[in-house]
């Protein structure tokens, strides 16, 4: 679990997302409250439940990006899913319980990787020993007394020399033969609606049939060291302990990001009796968000302390169109602002992996130096903002389209301009985009 303070979390999010301070503060406090709750003694700890968040804002302003970056900072089981993927129980499609099953799978993988990192040093030593045993087979004990001891000393000295060469990478390209555990063959089974759990158990049963068999392979030492380290680390893990920790991690620290929640509001389905009931999906979500117990192949998982963050553009619907019970499960409401011209400018240059830096790095691989003048950046931002206002407002995603169109010619002929410098100023931008951006019909299809 992350131990970062809210200010530190917001500072990290600022490196990748421009503006939206209210949303950043809300998720930062929610994440910090997970840590605070762990410091509270029982039985009060059990009574403290997370305050779920509803993020409201147009597309392309940073809702999904906040969730994506939060996942990296959280150091906790995290899943992002679209609410539109689910159907009411009884209809063809996925039911909402599969959210928790997917989350526990992520947690098991996370926990296994974390536990393997703890034993990796010891596993590497054992893997090196196995490789050295292949390179330097132990001599048979012949002779008595001093001769045998002298032979052992010589063998140990040789092993240490080879171990040093192995660690320095001098033996990486040498090939050896070794016996490795055969990977279990994957098996695809079509899952009937609502029977994903049984299907998973059948798949697991078949995959275990071939486990434990050895396969002789000829590989380079560099690859052999990695394969044997993974194999030795896996032997040191207690699978039951990993499962128990994973379930506990989901129950105490799990985060679910529900995107497109506005698409399952009842208003969107008025008069569409033939469609699958979206209101039914909302009712199915209720117990999950409030707290229930879901049966998974790793055991029962309680959702009482899982944090749910929902988001939606709410263009055609309002948060009040959600059923009242579900509205009450998301007490923290955060509105995200539409992006201004200044925001577009900052997105282009101020973030850690800005679009400008990305394109400069891409063209630098062909020895083309791309320079963006301040007036060129400003003009790009103005065009992106204007096109959003005239046509559909897709937020920051418009910048991808605009800058791709702007650099189309440079990217195409970069190989012919090696060693040259290309300056993108306001005049260059107007030449490349002016006509398209001003013609509404053209910009609707091109930008």
From Swiss-Prot:
Subcellular location: Cytoplasm
Main location: cytoplasm
CDD domains: RecA-like_HslU (cd19498)
Gene Ontology molecular function, alphabetical: ATP binding; ATP hydrolysis activity; peptidase activity; proteasome-activating activity
Keyword Ribonucleoprotein assigned: no
Keyword Isomerase: no
Residues engaged in binding ATP: 18, 60-65, 259, 325, 397
Disulphide connectivity of cysteines: none
Sorted UniProt keywords: ATP-binding, Chaperone, Cytoplasm, Nucleotide-binding, Stress response
Annotated InterPro entries: AAA+_ATPase (IPR003593), ATP-dep_Clp_protease_ClpX (IPR050052), ATPase_AAA_core (IPR003959), Clp_ATPase_C (IPR019489), HslU (IPR004491), P-loop_NTPase (IPR027417)
Swiss-Prot/TrEMBL GO biological process terms: protein unfolding; proteolysis involved in protein catabolic process
GO cellular component: HslUV protease complex
Family: Belongs to the ClpX chaperone family. HslU subfamily.
Protein purpose: ATPase subunit of a proteasome-like degradation complex; this subunit has chaperone activity. The binding of ATP and its subsequent hydrolysis by HslU are essential for unfolding of protein substrates subsequently hydrolyzed by HslV. HslU recognizes the N-terminal part of its protein substrates and unfolds these before they are guided to HslV for hydrolysis.
Subunit structure: A double ring-shaped homohexamer of HslV is capped on each side by a ring-shaped HslU homohexamer. The assembly of the HslU/HslV complex is dependent on binding of ATP.
Name this protein carries in UniProt: ATP-dependent protease ATPase subunit HslU
Species for this entry: Burkholderia vietnamiensis (strain G4 / LMG 22486)
Taxonomic lineage: Bacteria, Pseudomonadati, Pseudomonadota, Betaproteobacteria, Burkholderiales
């Amino acid at each position: 679990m992350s131990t970062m303070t809210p200010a530190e979390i917001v500072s990290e999010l600022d490196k990748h997302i421009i503006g939206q301070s209210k949303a950043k503060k809300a998720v930062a406090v929610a994440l910090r409250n997970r840590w605070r709750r762990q410091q509270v003694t029982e039985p009060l700890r059990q009574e403290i439940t997370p305050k779920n968040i509803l993020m409201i804002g147009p597309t392309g302003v940073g809702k999904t990006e906040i969730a994506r970056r939060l996942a990296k900072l959280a150091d906790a089981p995290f899943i992002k899913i679209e609410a539109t993927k689910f159907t009411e129980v009884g209809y063809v499609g996925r039911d909402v319980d599969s959210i928790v099953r997917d989350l526990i799978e992520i947690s098991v993988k996370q926990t296994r990787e974390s536990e393997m990192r703890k034993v990796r040093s010891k596993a590497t030593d054992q893997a090196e020993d196995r490789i050295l045993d292949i390179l330097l087979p132990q001599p048979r004990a012949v002779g008595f007394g001093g001769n045998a001891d002298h032979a052992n000393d010589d063998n140990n000295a040789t092993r240490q020399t080879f171990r040093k060469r192995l660690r320095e990478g001098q033996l990486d390209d040498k090939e050896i033969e070794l016996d490795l555990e055969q990977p279990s063959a994957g098996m695809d089974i079509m899952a009937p609606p609502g029977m994903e759990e049984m299907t998973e158990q059948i798949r697991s049963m078949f995959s275990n049939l071939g486990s434990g068999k050895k396969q002789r392979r000829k590989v380079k030492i560099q690859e052999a060291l990695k394969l044997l380290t993974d194999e030795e680390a896996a032997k040191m893990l207690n699978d039951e302990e990993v499962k128990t920790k994973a379930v506990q991690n989901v129950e105490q620290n799990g985060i679910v990001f529900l995107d497109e929640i506005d698409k399952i509001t009842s208003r969107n389905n008025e008069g569409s009796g033939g469609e699958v009931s979206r209101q039914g999906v909302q009712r199915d979500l209720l117990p999950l968000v409030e707290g229930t117990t879901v049966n998974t192949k790793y055991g029962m998982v309680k959702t009482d302390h899982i944090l749910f963050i929902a988001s939606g553009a709410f263009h055609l619907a309002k948060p009040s169109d959600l059923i009242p019970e579900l509205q009450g499960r998301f007490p923290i409401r955060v509105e995200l602002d539409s992006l201004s011209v200044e925001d577009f400018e900052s997105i282009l240059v101020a973030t850690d992996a800005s679009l400008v830096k990305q394109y400069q790095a891409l063209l630098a691989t062909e020895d083309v130096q791309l320079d963006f003048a301040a007036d060129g950046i400003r003009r790009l931002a103005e065009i992106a903002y204007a096109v959003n206002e005239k046509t559909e407002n897709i937020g920051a995603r418009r910048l991808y389209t605009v800058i791709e169109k702007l650099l189309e010619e440079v990217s195409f002929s970069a190989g012919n301009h090696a060693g040259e410098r290309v300056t993108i100023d306001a005049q260059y931008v107007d030449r490349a985009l002016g006509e398209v951006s001003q013609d509404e019909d053209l910009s609707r299809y091109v930008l």
